[in-house]
């Protein structure tokens, strides 16, 4: 029996998140169903992170044990041939038994897409958050800069998040303009449930209302969930990459 690491990508639009839920379509459920069909035995997968309902991934990492003797190239082809079109295996490789996708991860990168141009095709908003008012990217980046370092992110946590420590380290946070979109990129040690979406929602709200950028710092330092305001929609969030070095 060998342990396999898989890099996967998926469109989360039609799924109730990554983690298995009874009688609901999930990314984990779809992959485990396919692996069971191939190996003729139940296989449980472990992931680097559990994305929420509607969230997408370009570089999610999972691991699982496989008993059958098969070349990884053929295994990848077999899995992808049985998976639905909105979930794909990008690559497979063998790893040591001690490897844990979640606990061995050093950093994670997320991207959030904001559609900020009224002259757009309707489908461009399917996986982006449409904001009608022209956003000032310089003001947004002033707020993003306040995230760098180690902070207590209680303000941007969710009541249902049972994580003991709300302290997280952010290494990079930046808004970038790309055609009709403004893309928020953030790299951190790990993230709380709905944390990225809460951060984006507050920053956009401050910008739309033309409040002082320091308002964001006050909200961050308050450790008060009631100041979170609006949570940005899940459909525009992507897990881009998981770093292990």
Curated annotation (Swiss-Prot):
Active-site residue numbers: 52 (nucleophile)
Record-level Gene Ontology MF annotations: RNA binding; tRNA pseudouridine(38-40) synthase activity
First-tier enzyme category under EC: isomerase
GO BP terms: tRNA pseudouridine synthesis
UniProt keyword Transmembrane helix, yes or no: no
Reactions the enzyme catalyzes: uridine(38/39/40) in tRNA = pseudouridine(38/39/40) in tRNA
Keywords (A to Z) from UniProt: Isomerase, tRNA processing
Listed EC numbers: 5.4.99.12
Chain segments annotated as coiled-coil in the UniProt record: none
Residues noted as binding substrate in the record, renumbered to the chain: 110
A Pfam family annotated for this UniProt entry: PseudoU_synth_1
InterPro entries: PsdUridine_synth_cat_dom_sf, PsdUridine_synth_TruA, PsdUridine_synth_TruA_a/b_dom, PsdUridine_synth_TruA_C, TruA/RsuA/RluB/E/F_N
Family the UniProt entry places it in: Belongs to the tRNA pseudouridine synthase TruA family.
Function as written in the Swiss-Prot or TrEMBL entry: Formation of pseudouridine at positions 38, 39 and 40 in the anticodon stem and loop of transfer RNAs.
Oligomer and partners: Homodimer.
Name of the featured protein: tRNA pseudouridine synthase A
